[in-house]
Amino acid sequence: RINGLSMIMTLDFREQLHMKQKRDYNAEIRDTADHRYAYGFDFDVMHPYMIRSFDPFFRAGNLLELGSFKGDFTRRLLERFDEVTCVEASGNAIDEAKRKLGDKATYIHSRFETAALPMRYDNIVLTHVLEHLDDPVAVLRRINDEWLADGGRLFLVCPNANAPSR
């Protein structure tokens, strides 16, 4: 029985891994009748609050936004930085961001787990994204080991995904 249980757990793990490889990031960002991906509160209240909170701690230099969605927060970051790189898994979200912002930012269509970034960054912003990742620890490790410049700063906001309001 122990071997049988071990085998079931292994199959379950393989099924989970297979499911993770088939994620459709374009579908995940779509609003439906019973699910909204983003709310006006995020844009009208949270975005200005986060910018005010981050602003005194931003370093001069470049910025990497991980999970740029449709560019709404990116627009606010572009008011403060000349060089902004955005990594987003949804091609549809990148297309919409480009329609809004043009070529003011550099867009990389990739998952964080596999992104090949050209440099290190003085500021890295990860807002309302960590809870969506398949392996958040691995992504945080990449941020620290590969992408954050010496003396760079990580700005991380993670909502309580299990809050009663969600």
Model-derived segments and spans:
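Conserved class I S-adenosyl-L-methionine
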Residues: 155-166
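Conserved catalytic-core motifs of eukaryotic protein kinase domains, centered on the activation segment
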Residues: 135-136, 166
